[in-house]
Amino acid sequence: MTRWWRSRYICRSQCSNVKNSTCSQQILYIHLLILSYTTITKSFFKTLNHHQKSMFKVIRLKYIFEINSCISHPSILDLYVLKNTILLIL
């Protein structure tokens, strides 16, 4: 099981009892964050030009913002642990 799938499973189990329509969308952003950082290696990042690197950093900030929004929801505070795990991956 890859890191992304393992994290996805954790996300779903943490969020399984939440009756909140935004939860699944926010979890999707977390999945995308995990996927983007586990598939883009440092060597690939070095091949990007300045504009591409800037765009990538903007996307990174957007996803981190979404994670913070997600974990601030009282029903899914358990995702705080997952968020810290993701930030360690970064």
Curated annotation (Swiss-Prot):
It comes from the Viruses. This is Protein A54.
